[in-house]
């Protein structure tokens, strides 16, 4: 359904994610200078990016490649490009139907535009309850478990110790409210993203001569053109399905989480934040997920083969160790943990 909506929104907006792609970057970079009672567009962008970027970019990509083969990465790209239009629409709606709270911050999101736009308070409350349950309990457990397993495999730290540390770090930030969360993500997200991308680029440059083979495997696997590149279950459907599923899990376009952060921004026009949040989908999947995928595929059959039995998070660690030895364990763990 989310892929179908992405196609509909792409057609309806005449490919806004392609037509205004350069303008998105200009708006995002320029928004760092904003001042206002609510959050700046850049702060709202980093809050959204902190939610998107995390274990989905590591464990999610790894699982997509294990189950769907190299071609799954191609379908993650397609889903992300379509998802940019979905993200644009949901974030723009969040701005249109937002309300000003007593704390001076703007509040909005799907629950608000379901109530105020569709006139259904009941469905708005139901959506809000489901969102709180999903993002308050389920998704944090997935993220935290991946982090705990990484620390356990790299340093032998018990899972329960990592859990306590994560709680101790998170509580002061959350108790400070949205402004404190935004202040932290505004500085932390760019730094950690740059570190991850730099290490990824170093890995790619070390294996630059093998990059054509990686792209060949991705495109051949995406369309079932070569035997041995399909994942568990085999066939083109397994590749497409797993790529799309993991792509949506990673970039969260259309899931209803991003608009809540988008609504908090002070912008001159609702479309401005829609464009900026749309860029987050691109950064998450086309850039960060691709880096993880390239590092795994560049490691070759000694580390990765489609359909292999290996924990998804461990695959990324094994690939990084293959390229950069023990540095990779520290890098992967430390760059993932802050996003939780």
Name each region found by the language model:
Residues 27-49, 80, 91, 95-135, ...:
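Transmembrane-helix boundary/entry motifs in multi-pass membrane transporters
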Residues 44-106, 116-120, 274-301:
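Membrane-interface helix-loop-helix modules in multi-pass membrane proteins
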Residues 9-10, 52, 62-68, 94-100, ...:
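Helix-loop junctions at the membrane interface of multi-pass solute transporters
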Residues 5-25, 145-151, 158-219:
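Membrane-interface loop-to-helix entry segments
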Residues 14-46, 223-253, 259-275, 279-282:
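Membrane-embedded helical hairpins/re-entrant loop segments and their flanking transmembrane helices
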Residues 330-336:
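Conserved small/polar residues in nucleotide/adenosyl-binding loops
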Residues 1-55, 65-72, 83:
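N-terminal alpha-helical transmembrane segments of multi-pass membrane transport
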Residues 89-98, 199-217, 228-231, 264-265, ...:
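Extracellular/periplasmic helix-exit of transmembrane alpha-helices
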């Amino acid at each position: 359904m989310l892929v179908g909506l992405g196609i509909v929104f792409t057609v309806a907006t005449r490919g806004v994610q392609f037509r205004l792609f350069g303008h998105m970057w200009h708006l995002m970079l320029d928004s760092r200078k904003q001042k206002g009672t609510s959050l700046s567009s850049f702060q709202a962008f980093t809050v959204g990016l902190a939610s998107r970027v995390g274990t989905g970019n590591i464990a999610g990509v790894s699982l997509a490649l294990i189950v769907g083969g190299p071609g799954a990465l191609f379908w993650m790209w397609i889903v992300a490009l379509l998802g940019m239009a979905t993200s644009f629409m949901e974030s723009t709606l969040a701005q249109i139907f937002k309300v000003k709270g007593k704390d001076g911050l703007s509040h909005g999101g799907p629950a608000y535009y379901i109530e105020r736009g569709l006139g259904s308070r009941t469905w708005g409350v139901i959506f809000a309850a489901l969102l709180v349950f999903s993002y308050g309990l389920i998704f944090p457990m997935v993220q935290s478990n991946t982090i705990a397993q990484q620390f356990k495999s790299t340093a032998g730290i018990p899972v329960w110790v990592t859990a306590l540390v994560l709680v101790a770090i998170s509580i002061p930030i959350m108790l400070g409210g949205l402004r404190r969360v935004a202040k932290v993500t505004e500085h932390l997200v760019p730094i950690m993203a740059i570190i991850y991308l730099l290490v990824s680029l170093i890995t790619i440059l070390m294996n630059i001569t093998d990059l054509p083979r990686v792209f060949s495997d991705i495109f051949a696997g995406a369309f079932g053109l070569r035997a041995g590149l399909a994942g568990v279950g085999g066939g083109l459907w397994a590749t497409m399905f797993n790529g799309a599923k993991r792509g949506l899990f990673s970039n969260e376009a259309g899931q209803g989480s991003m608009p809540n952060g988008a609504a908090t921004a002070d912008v001159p026009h609702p479309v401005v934040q829609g464009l900026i949040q749309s860029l987050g989908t691109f950064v998450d999947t086309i850039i960060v997920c691709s880096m993880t995928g390239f590092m795994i595929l560049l490691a070759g059959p000694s580390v990765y083969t489609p359909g292999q039995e290996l924990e998804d998070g461990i695959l990324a660690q094994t690939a990084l160790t293959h390229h950069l030895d023990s540095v990779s364990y520290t890098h992967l763990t430390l760059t993932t943990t802050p996003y939780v």
